[in-house]
Swiss-Prot record:
It catalyses: a 3'-end 3'-phospho-ribonucleotide-RNA + a 5'-end dephospho-ribonucleoside-RNA + GTP = a ribonucleotidyl-ribonucleotide-RNA + GMP + diphosphate; a 3'-end 2',3'-cyclophospho-ribonucleotide-RNA + a 5'-end dephospho-ribonucleoside-RNA + GTP + H2O = a ribonucleotidyl-ribonucleotide-RNA + GMP + diphosphate + H(+). Gene3D superfamilies: Homing endonucleases, tRNA-splicing ligase RtcB. Essential for tRNA splicing and maturation. Acts by directly joining spliced tRNA halves to mature-sized tRNAs. Joins RNA with 2',3'-cyclic-phosphate or 3'-phosphate ends to RNA with 5'-hydroxy ends. Belongs to the RtcB family. The gene is rtcB. PROSITE patterns: INTEIN_C_TER, INTEIN_ENDONUCLEASE, INTEIN_N_TER. This is tRNA-splicing ligase RtcB. It holds the Pfam family RtcB.
Length: 871
């Protein structure tokens, strides 16, 4: 989607209501550098989709640190009417569930790739998906390939089906069953799951050029220009378009012709030509249905291209014969889709599959089929025509499982179910059902088949990473090993110490923090609560922590919402979420979560800084962590619930990730209660970490944190949260549910929600930078209330994925570079240091400058790091 932008001023941009589904415009806060980064992913498209949701007020907003998220952009803000609007987990914060490395993913061209190969080599490749609503397989481009660390105590689930298909992934990864999606952990032996029976072929890489401009010497220059504009020349072996061209050429040799005036026409059934047209459109070629059984290509240039690729000959072109197996497979599937016979059975025995054409071409086809272990004979018919015949059962099975048909939906679906049946025959002894019985009992539209699960195991992963793929298609699934698969915050603690006092002991201090505050992937807290004991934490948040000795009573005055959202309901949180959260309470986690010892090195507003208790040269500590696995599980649980409910409420669904329900619905209110519980867990978590930070300072400096070191909390802000607030819209006060995803509340002076000790100057806003760069403290403003529902940015925002960062940076080198700059880093692994390299993030100075110039937050102070502890 190309999203138009209208410049308002130097740092404000508007996404106009260019799509009739948009209820409001989009508003983007960014300079030109930051905006260009947003254009490189789906940030602006996601903001456009948010603008389509019911009950939205004013704008769909993107902060300068905005980047692509799940459903909503990270750095996105949207306010919905509490009566007419919606609530969406994707607008508050959500991650992904994943599959094991080595999992094979099926592409549109019929070859498999390992899921971990996708990010580097095949990000432009389209994948096969199951279009649930229309009941057939389809193709989709990839939105993202994501990865995450496997937790130290995390288990994976491995399931095996009766035909030997295996899938292994995180416990929360969904697979498709006849009744809908089910988490891997909930699959039981004897259950049925949906599989895509096609086996396909391995990928073979071939380098070089198939066709370049020299092939068109003497032709009209417009032909070359047309083809170059559509990236159809030069045509290289590695180009994903080659597979499409191979199957179109196969179809054209049987059911296409080029007229004397260079018009290209395909003929066939309407549903077949519809599929051909989709492939043509993917190449940028327009085609129109001239009659019920004819599809005409409007460009003579494409006809010239097919001629050069071999359509004018009565034999298979050399480039197909010389090509890798997957290219041959696409050519043959297009050819048999056009003119091959549909597979039929007599009881449990398959009848021969035939193809009628010239003897020369059939001889070529027979030779190519041998590479797929398919034996064929060529026979002469009564009328002098020639027929290729595949008649032995092994060859029929290999043809259906490795080649099959393209373009003809009926042939393809029946061929897939037939292949599954022939595999089923091998496994069954006696009492064998006929093919037609099997198709009725196990077959689904599109050629999908229900297979019984014969083994389910919980296993300890022998690998470090899980992977997942996001696709653009609304089906939001992909074929993996033949199976269809489918609140955070920041706290700032001040001290009375100066850099001069801390610098000599910075290594000892950071090492002590690292020792006392559990961190790392799957890290567990120092206290041991059973999952049945955390309901009080979910209700009382930071108050529970203080009541249990983790902090001081006055801490609660300095936390957003007092560290406790009213209305949290532990009953709305699943047992699984509690089981994930309980052992992690009081731990930092990994990735971009951190403890950072900082020095206030610049004061922009002395009056406000004084109110916040800050001075130049002062040492402060910043804590960034959230609700850990509990918060993720809450979002995951309710996404599934809402996906089932959304059709009931007839809510627009512009993006599969952007699931939502009416805020006042039963599902909406229950999710809001669960989200509050997750937020309370996060506040309790940061409160416990604060207690251990104070203990660490006491251990190193031998001084009392309260009486000597003055280690008060400056403030604690949430940046993945939904809140019911009152705001002014078009001169009227309205109640809204504000979604802040990777965005921070920024209330102005005088607002009743701002703590009394800061009410004269405005709410503190904490903006962490990336590792090794500055962080900022700002103050909320009236400008934020007027423009952004009292919201501003939350940090620097990534520009490189974690995988890309590890390819570009080495953790040990980054750590040494930071040490050379006077920043000591202690991390659970050097990989995390590489993932969090400063270059993996946007320039936080630019981000803060934009919000300051926009007047949606006011600069107060800048802090630079001198010590970092990371999980």
């Amino acid at each position: 989607m190309v999203v138009p932008l209208k410049r308002i001023d130097k740092i404000r941009w508007e996404i106009p209501k260019f799509d009739k589904r948009m209820r409001v415009p989009g508003r983007v806060y960014a300079d030109e550098v930051l905006l260009e980064k947003m254009k490189n992913d789906r940030t602006l498209e996601q903001a456009t989709n948010v603008a389509m949701l019911p009950g939205i007020y004013k704008y769909s907003i993107v902060m300068p640190d905005g980047h692509q998220g799940y459903g909503f952009p990270i750095g996105g803000v949207a306010a919905f009417d509490v009566k007419e609007g919606v609530i969406s987990p994707g607008g508050i914060g959500y991650d992904i569930n994943c599959l094991a490395p080595g999992t094979r993913v099926l592409t549109e061209h019929g070859y498999w790739l390992k899921i971990e190969e996708m990010p580097e080599k095949f990000k432009l490749q389209r994948l096969r998906v199951y279009n649930i609503e229309e009941g057939h397989n389809d193709f989709s481009k990839v939105v993202f390939v994501a990865e995450r660390e496997v937790g130290s105590e995390e288990k994976a689930i491995r399931i095996v089906t009766e035909s030997g298909k295996v899938i292994e992934g995180s416990e929360d990864h969904p697979v498709l069953t006849p009744e809908g999606y089910v988490y891997l952990r909930n699959v039981k032996e004897g259950d049925y799951i949906l599989v895509y029976p096609f086996e396909g072929v391995p990928y073979e890489e071939k380098k070089g050029v198939i066709l370049d401009e020299s092939a068109f010497e003497g032709e009209d220059p417009q032909v070359v220009k047309f083809l170059r504009e559509r990236n159809l020349i030069p045509l290289q072996w590695k180009d994903p378009k080659v597979g499409i061209l191979a199957r179109i050429l196969g179809f054209a040799l049987a059911n296409g012709y080029i007229s004397e005036n260079d018009n290209l026409t395909f003929h066939g059934k309407e549903e077949v030509l519809r599929e051909v047209r989709k492939d043509l459109e993917e190449l940028g070629i327009e085609a129109i249905v001239a009659e019920e059984d004819k599809l005409k290509v409007t460009s003579r240039e494409f006809a010239f291209l097919l001629e050069k690729l071999g359509m004018a000959h009565d034999s298979i072109p050399e480039w197909i014969i010389e090509g890798p197996l997957w290219i041959k497979r696409n050519f043959l599937a297009g050819l048999f889709g056009a003119n091959g016979s549909i597979v039929e059975f007599k009881g449990d025995v398959p009848l021969p599959i035939t193809l009628t054409h010239s003897r020369e071409l059939l001889n070529d086809v027979s030779r190519i089929l041998e590479g797929f272990k398919v034996r064929a004979k060529i026979k002469m018919g009564k009328n002098g025509s020639y027929q290729l015949v595949i008649e032995d059962e092994d060859s029929i099975r290999n043809f259906l499982g490795r080649i099959n048909y393209e373009y003809d939906p009926e042939k393809k679906a029946r061929g897939l179910i037939a292949y599954a049946y022939l595999k089923f025959k091998e496994l069954m002894k006696g009492n064998l059902m006929t093919f037609e019985e099997f198709a009725r009992d196990r077959g689904y539209e599109g050629g999908f088949v229900a297979e019984k699960v014969i083994e389910v195991k919980s296993v300890k992963p022998e690998y470090d990473k899980f992977y997942d793929i996001g696709v653009y298609h609304s089906a939001h699934n992909f074929i993996a090993n033949g199976i269809v698969v489918h609140n955070c915050g920041v706290r700032l603690i001040r001290t009375n110490l100066t850099e001069k006092e801390v610098r000599p002991r910075i290594k000892q201090l950071v090492d002590t923090l690292f020792k006392n505050v559990p961190s790392g992937v799957g890290s567990q807290g120092r206290i041991k609560l059973h999952w049945t004991q955390i309901d009080d934490v979910l209700v009382d948040g930071a108050k529970w922590a203080v009541d249990n000795g983790y902090g001081w009573e006055r801490d609660l005055e300095r936390l957003e919402e007092g560290g406790r959202m009213e209305g949290a309901d532990p009953e709305a949180v699943s047992q699984r979420a509690k089981q994930r959260g309980a052992p992690q309470l009081g731990s930092l986690g990994s990735g971009n979560h951190f403890l950072e010892v900082q020095v206030v090195d610049k004061i922009f507003d002395p009056e406000v800084a004084k109110a916040y208790g800050l001075f130049e040269g002062q040492v402060v500590v910043m804590v960034h962590t959230g609700s850990r696995g509990l918060g993720h599980q809450v979002a995951s649980d309710y996404l599934r619930i809402m996906e089932r409910a959304i059709r009931k409420y007839r809510i627009p669904w512009p993006d599969r990730e952007l699931v939502s329900v009416p805020f006042q619905s039963e599902e909406g209110q229950r999710y809001f209660s669960a989200m509050k519980a997750a937020a309370n867990f996060a506040w309790a978590n940061r409160q416990m970490i604060t207690h251990w930070v104070r203990e660490s300072f006491q251990e190193v400096f031998k001084q009392d944190p309260e009486g000597d070191l003055g280690m008060d909390i400056v403030y604690d802000v949430a940046h993945n949260i939904g809140k019911v607030e009152e705001h002014e819209v078009d001169g009227k006060r309205v109640k809204v549910i504000v979604h802040r995803k990777g965005a921070t509340r920024a209330f102005p002076p005088g607002h009743e929600a701002v703590p009394r000790l800061y009410r004269d100057v405005g709410q503190p806003v904490l903006i962490p930078g990336s590792m090794g760069t500055a962080s900022y403290i700002l103050a909320g403003t009236e400008g934020a209330m007027k423009e952004t529902f009292g919201s501003t940015c939350h940090g620097a925002g990534r520009v490189l994925s974690r995988k890309a960062a590890t390819r570009q940076y080495r953790g040990d080198r980054i750590r040494q570079e930071l040490l050379n700059r006077g920043i000591y880093v202690r991390a659970a692994s050097m990989r995390v240091v590489a993932e969090e390299a400063p270059g993996a993030y946007k320039n936080v100075d630019n981000v803060v400058k934009v919000v300051s110039e926009a007047g949606i937050a006011k600069l107060v102070a800048r802090m630079r790091p001198i010590g970092v502890a990371k999980g």
